[in-house]
Amino acid sequence: AVTVGSEIAAGVMDVHIKDCLFMNTDRGLRVKTRRGRGKLSVLDDISFENIDMDNVMTPFVVNSFYFCDPDGKTEYVGSKKPLPVDDRTPSIKKFTFKNINAKNCHVAGTYICGLPESKIEELTFENINITYADNAKSGVAAMMLGCDEASRQGMIVSNINTLILDNVKVTGCDGEEIVAENVDNIIKK
């Protein structure tokens, strides 16, 4: 697994991860931040490419409500309501996920959750194939308040300006392939 964050007070930019194999991990590609990390906590121009995953609980997680700090379970960090943007507000700009095969997933194909007051600017998923384990185990997709235990969920996405889905296949989930909330533009190619 590759994790970016959660303590990224100076930001993370221009990072490219490629040619990886993840097996038997709880998450595959995980980004975590939260309110309070600061306005310099900017994540931008990060790409993940040519990655194979097998038996991963949730292959793609971008979590703007990460709660594993002493103050991580406060109302300020966990509130799903838009709060004022100030010097404590982090931001997520552009991410690209390309040429990724995730098989035998368990909990969710993706769990992407930006802040309502500082939406993720742009996420691109290109040439992505997600399939689920026949005996999928339930679990929690992201470490945040209000994320309930589940299994075989599709692409859960929220608080995004632009979501680009180019040749994305989600096979074997229970329910909708894409569950979007507060996403301004979904572009399917």
What is each residue range found by the language model?
Residues 1-189:
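Extracellular/periplasmic carbohydrate-active domains that bind, remodel
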